[in-house]
Amino acid sequence: MTLDIVNWKAIIEALLYAAGDEGLTKKQLMSVLEVEEVALLDMMSAVKEEYQKQERGIELIEYADSYMLLTKKEYSIYLKKLVETPSKGLSQAALEVLAIVSYKQPITRSEVEEIRGVKSERVLHSLVAKALLCEVGRADGPGRAILYGTTPTFLEQFGLKALDELPPLPENVEADGVQEEADLFFENFNQTFEEIK
């Protein structure tokens, strides 16, 4: 029985390593391993615990109903030195749009522009191209405008398992205008972005 457990752990590790940045969903793992969800959850819990106990450079992370292997945060400084390149980060405009969409989704381009006070079409297209945002539907009414929302890649990049882990917006803020709302979005979102950099 112990040998079987070791084999399952090795197989899971190999699968997640091969999947890379995208990770694997519970459904994919259950299909490949031919196990029920309860058995999979037990196995993933055992693998995660093993990584935490040992002095390993990687850990098992669960996000948006998927699993992936990531390097541990304490070693991020070394990885940063390895992969650091100029202009790799997101622009202020991109962070503003991400903040607005993440808190207000689903949201149309015109609603984003109303909050920001400037055109945002190019920024939205750029964020869609980077797989941080995607089309999640169409608005009712004339023109059936595209509704934007965040993606699993967004959650992964910002170290979140779900959107409810975003920092809450203060409830006692008076809405004196859309600029103040945009500033509030950006301030909260930028703080989160800085914490995980």
From Swiss-Prot:
Function: Participates in chromosomal partition during cell division. May act via the formation of a condensin-like complex containing Smc and ScpA that pull DNA away from mid-cell into both cell halves.
SUPFAM superfamilies: Winged helix' DNA-binding domain (SSF46785)
Protein name (Swiss-Prot/TrEMBL): Segregation and condensation protein B
InterPro entries, per the entry: ScpB_csome_segregation, WH-like_DNA-bd_sf, WH_DNA-bd_sf
Keyword Cell division applies: yes
Keywords from the UniProt entry: Cell cycle, Cell division, Chromosome partition, Cytoplasm
Gene: scpB
Superkingdom of the organism of origin: Bacteria
NCBIfam families: SMC-Scp complex subunit ScpB
Coiled-coil segments: none
Main localization, broad class: cytoplasm
Keyword rRNA-binding: no
One GO-annotated biological process of the protein: DNA replication
Family statement drawn from the similarity comment of this UniProt entry: Belongs to the ScpB family.
Localization terms from the record: Cytoplasm
Entry's Gene Ontology cellular component terms: cytoplasm
Protein's organism: Bacillus pumilus (strain SAFR-032)
